[in-house]
Design a protein with these regions (language model features):
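Conserved SAM-binding loop
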Residues: 1-86, 219, 266-272
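Short intrinsically disordered terminal tails
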Residues: 294-296
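S-adenosyl-L-methionine-dependent methyltransferase catalytic module, highlighting the catalytic core
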Residues: 58-61, 65, 75-282, 287-291
Length: 296
């Protein structure tokens, strides 16, 4: 079983892939280069909150690769933010706020951020991060219902933060990258002015993988999966799966708490009759297309 773009949520009984490895059980690899395993290697492939961070054509290539490395009859499980639910809640809160409901007006502001912020932000955390970290948040229960673990992490103090620190090598790379980018901005500012330097900073940020480049609902995701050969598409919950004993791995939920309640959970199957073929070779992606492990 393969977990693609696992981030900090993985099980050592799976094969785990991520752009940045913080553990020996995570293989460091850029999935924009494909998936580095032979055809038909896995009975299940899973990726959660990865697809929306890719451009549409990159997402299509990822699905092709998932199809390739799955054995016939294998299960693909995808988790993404649910555009349909976000849109419905946005319209519901909009109507209630328009009618004078002050509580709904607060929720409306959040739903507008949830819909747009990760698409348009130009700095880490955007508007959502500071909002969730605020001690004066008015609709904490609603926001917690929407984003789950992310809200708890934003509310946590440094003293109780339990997320594992990056390795020394990752920290060194981050410092080196920051140094290079800082000098690049200074050079651009000197040569082209402040506005061009600001454009460079924004471009560098948006290429790091935090932003969302596309959104999906059950209809568009079903169409996409069927286009690339999958069948038996179904929408499920965090606790339902064709993957044997899936719940025990706690990838989508801990006990009864769903990690990302704003998610759409789907599964589809590679047909038993599928003929395994090699994916079409392609050129190396530009550095700013690399998928970051940092997802929100």
């Amino acid at each position: 079983m393969l977990n693609v773009g696992c981030g900090r949520r993985y099980d050592r009984r799976w094969v785990n892939l991520d752009l940045a490895s913080r553990d020996a059980s995570v293989v460091q690899y850029d999935i924009n280069k494909g998936i580095p395993f032979a055809d038909g290697s896995f009975d299940a492939v899973y990726h959660s909150h990865v697809l929306e961070h890719l451009k549409p054509d990159q997402g299509e290539r990822l699905l092709q690769e998932c199809f390739r490395v799955l054995a016939p009859g294998g299960v693909l499980r995808i988790v993404v933010p649910d555009l349909e639910t976000i849109a419905r809640l946005y319209l519901q809160k909009h109507q209630q706020a328009w009618s004078g409901d002050e509580d709904a007006a607060v929720d409306y502001n959040w739903m507008k951020m949830e819909l747009l912020d990760q698409l348009v932000r130009d700095q880490s955390g955007g508007r959502m991060g500071p909002y969730m970290a605020s001690s004066a948040i008015q609709n904490s229960d609603f926001v917690r219902q929407r984003v789950g673990d992310e809200f708890s992490l934003c509310q946590a103090t440094p003293e109780i933060e339990t997320v594992r620190k990056p390795s020394l090598m990752l920290r060194f790379r981050a410092i080196t990258r920051s140094f290079r980018e800082r000098w690049a901005r200074r050079c651009v500012r000197w040569l082209l002015g402040t506005k061009k330097a600001a454009a460079l900073r924004e471009g560098l940020f948006r290429g790091q993988g935090e932003i969302h480049r596309w959104m999906y609902d059950r209809y568009s995701l079903r169409h996409l999966c069927q286009e690339y050969g999958f069948e038996k598409f179904n929408v499920c919950t965090a606790f339902e799966s064709r993957i044997e004993d899936y719940v025990q791995y706690q990838l989508d939920a801990d006990q009864e708490a769903i990690r990302k309640p704003d998610s759409l959970f789907i599964e589809c199957v590679k047909p038993i009759s599928a003929v395994i073929t090699k994916a079409t070779p392609r050129t190396e992606p530009a550095e700013n297309e690399l998928l970051s492990a940092k997802v929100a």
